[in-house]
Amino acid sequence: MTETPLAGFTVVVTRPARQNDALVQQLQAQGANVVAIPLLAIDPLDAPTQCQKIDRQLHDLQQCQLAIFISQNAAEQTLQAMAERNLVWPAHIQVFAIGSATTAFLAAHGISATSPQQMNSEGLLALPALQQVSGQHCLVFRGLGGRETLAQTLRERNATVDYCELYRRQLPAEAAAHWTKWLSDLQNRTALICINSIETLKHLQAVDPAASLRDNLTLVVPGERVTRAATAAGFAHIITANDATDNAMLHTITLHAAPTGIRHD
């Protein structure tokens, strides 16, 4: 008999649409009722001035010694932009990446990247290879806006740091309607909500400003930063995964669903 430890549990996944597939399959294989409500969309920057800056930075890559990819989205958008310009990644650049998915994506495209076990800026900054960077030029690939810890610390270590911002993180237009409908279907039952970033948490608050049925929802979040943000936002039921990978989120959900946990049916 197939073991289904998540039978009777409802789990909502909120990543951009095509990025949910693997986790959805894993959750369903363990018996969960999975609902996909993307609360994040990745939209490439397309304003003329933004495109001109990206174009200039990508053509000047030969001048960089270091490159950092903040996420898989950053890696995907960068390689897509380079392909559109018929550019090839320079072999001399030392590449760093946050997250195993980012590293795997780059590897699949022939780019070897160093990634910290602690999948955040602090973990990256602790790597031995980034301690002595004086005089080196580092380009950080990311979305519009974000944390400044990485660039600030590398500049304190006398590196020259620039951002190549290729996309914006948006709330999908249909998200609020999907969320409202799902809440009406939920009624008095409970559910687990996978919130993979602070940006996604903000979007959850945007689609549900009245915090409907908040007591019925348990957030599954990666790491202490998102945990603190969720607590500050008023969520009382939070479980914390080691990171945002599918395996870490699934492991945390499965532990929560163990016999000592609360059944969600």
Show where each model-derived region lies.
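Signature of uroporphyrinogen-III synthase
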Residues: 1-265
